[in-house]
């Protein structure tokens, strides 16, 4: 047995009986004792003496004693850190995501701010979504990137809590915008109610930001108290037995994913059902109705089905764009939400050796959504595409133009031909 200590106020205890091993315990205040001999090899008479010595060490005179026994307490499990190749790959991916997220969403915000023609209700909502994604790229992604490079959090506990608040604030705001747009599409296509205007869109944006802040703010004040991350590249939820902590994780998972997912899914199912019924009703009209029945039915009776067909074409394309955004949201956020819940309630999952790598890949997948959104706007929305090309310097206009069949063919002032000599205005 080896006993070691750091010298301040010594006291010596020796084995009192003959025939025992020459075992001496040197006890010091503020000392560190390291017992390295396994228990089976200790002399039987040393047991009572060891207990007596430890009791003496815990007396008021030795209140600062720290004992480290490798024979009794196993070493804590050490998680598997990232190897150099994985670090390089993850760092390169994050740099790409950060670059595209910041510049792409910045362009979206500038287009809506600078161009009056772009300030429709839907575009204002999309600008708010882009603003949240841009702030996520500025206030969260760089620190996660540094943590990947250093494999430890170096920014302190306060900023750990603050970054967690920012993360969930921007996430909840982005989800709220998707929810508002989906409900608006549902009201327009299913309920035939177009209630959203730019003023109401701004009010809804203010309400969504206030709601997101009220949900995320407790993280900044340490309720629940997040520890400095040692098993993830940023402050995330980890295993705990605290019921309040667990309740908060469930609440934020419901608000940020499950409730919006169910509401948006219901809205999209209703929209798809309505579009299918409208398509069947429109195609049920005979081809010659314009010419053979125009004099009997009148032009006003013909205007509604044809106008419905035109409106459904536009609404279907806008709905498809929102559907793509929703699909990206599901693919990027469903794994991370599941991971957060399992890590909070499963000790085995949280303490497995490759948890750091798992959490990093899933977090990167979440950040990928912020980079994909502006690319979807550019691909699907012609106004954003054209405005983006107008803002770019001529030397950088290398992006291809949209195919001809995707350009808008119908204008609100157009005249739609019903027959050879009949038109509907």
Swiss-Prot record:
The record describes its membrane topology as:
Multi-pass membrane protein
Q: So which residues have sugars stuck on them?
A: 22, 34, 68
Gene Ontology terms for molecular function: G protein-coupled receptor activity
Enumerate the UniProt keywords alphabetically.
Cell membrane, G-protein coupled receptor, Glycoprotein, Membrane, Receptor, Transducer, Transmembrane, Transmembrane helix
Stored SMART domains = 7TM_GPCR_Srsx
- Tissue-wise expression: Brain specific.
What are the record's GO terms for cellular component? cytosol; membrane; nucleoplasm; plasma membrane; receptor complex
Its domain of life reads Eukaryota
Q: What does the UniProt entry say about where the protein is found? A: Cell membrane
Q: Which Pfam families match?
A: 7tm_1
Where it mainly occurs, coarsely classed, is membrane
Q: Which residue intervals are topologically Extracellular?
A: 1-87, 149-165, 223-247, 346-357
Membrane-spanning intervals of the chain: 88-112, 124-148, 166-190, 203-222, 248-272, 322-345, 358-379
- Statement: the UniProt record of this protein carries the keyword Glycoprotein: yes
Q: Which residues lie on this side of the membrane: Cytoplasmic?
A: 113-123, 191-202, 273-321, 380-425
Question: Which family is annotated?
Answer: Belongs to the G-protein coupled receptor 1 family.
For this protein, the record's PANTHER family field holds:
G-PROTEIN COUPLED RECEPTOR, G-PROTEIN COUPLED RECEPTOR 63-RELATED
The record's function comment reads: Orphan receptor. May play a role in brain function.
Please identify the protein, giving its name as recorded. Probable G-protein coupled receptor 63
Protein source organism: Mus musculus
Q: Which gene encodes it?
A: Gpr63
């Amino acid at each position: 047995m080896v006993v070691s200590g750091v010298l301040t106020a010594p006291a010596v205890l020796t084995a009192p009986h003959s025939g025992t091993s020459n075992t001496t315990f040197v006890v010091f205040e503020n000392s560190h004792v390291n017992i390295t001999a396994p228990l089976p090899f200790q002399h039987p008479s040393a047991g009572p003496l060891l207990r007596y010595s430890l009791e003496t060490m815990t007396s008021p005179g030795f209140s600062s004693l720290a004992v480290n026994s490798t024979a009794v307490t196993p070493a804590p499990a050490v998680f598997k850190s990232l190897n150099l190749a994985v670090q390089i790959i993850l760092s390169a991916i994050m740099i790409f995501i950060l670059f595209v997220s910041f510049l792409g969403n910045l362009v979206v915000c500038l287009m809506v701010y600078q161009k009056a023609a772009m300030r429709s209700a839907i575009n204002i909502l999309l600008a708010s979504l882009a603003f949240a994604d841009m702030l996520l790229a500025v206030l969260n992604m760089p620190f996660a990137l540094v943590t990947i490079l250093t494999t430890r959090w170096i920014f302190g506990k306060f900023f750990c809590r603050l970054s967690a608040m920012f993360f969930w604030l921007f996430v909840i705001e982005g989800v709220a915008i998707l929810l508002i747009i989906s409900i608006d599409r549902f009201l327009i296509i299913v309920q035939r109610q177009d209630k959203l205007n730019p003023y109401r869109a701004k009010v809804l944006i203010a309400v969504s930001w206030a709601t997101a802040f009220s949900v995320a703010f407790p993280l900044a004040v340490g309720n629940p108290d997040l520890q400095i991350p040692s098993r993830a590249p940023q402050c995330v939820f980890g295993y705990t037995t605290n019921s309040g902590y667990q309740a908060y994780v469930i609440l934020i998972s419901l608000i940020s994913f499950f409730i919006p997912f169910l509401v948006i899914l219901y809205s999209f199912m209703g929209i798809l059902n309505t579009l299918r019924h409208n398509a069947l009703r429109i195609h049920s009209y005979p081809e010659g109705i314009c010419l053979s029945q125009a004099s009997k039915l009148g032009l006003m009776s013909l205007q509604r089905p044809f106008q419905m067909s035109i409106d459904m074409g536009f609404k279907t394309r806008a709905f498809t764009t929102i559907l793509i955004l929703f699909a990206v949201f599901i693919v990027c956020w469903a794994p991370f939400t599941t991971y957060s819940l399992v890590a909070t309630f499963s000790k085995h999952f949280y303490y497995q050796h490759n948890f750091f790598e798992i959490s990093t890949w899933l977090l990167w997948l979440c950040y990928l959504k912020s980079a994909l959104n502006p690319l979807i706007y550019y691909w699907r929305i012609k106004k954003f595409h054209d405005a983006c090309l107008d803002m770019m310097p001529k030397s950088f206009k290398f992006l291809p133009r949209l195919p001809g069949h995707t350009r808008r063919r119908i204008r609100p002032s157009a005249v739609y031909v019903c027959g050879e000599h009949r038109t509907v205005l």
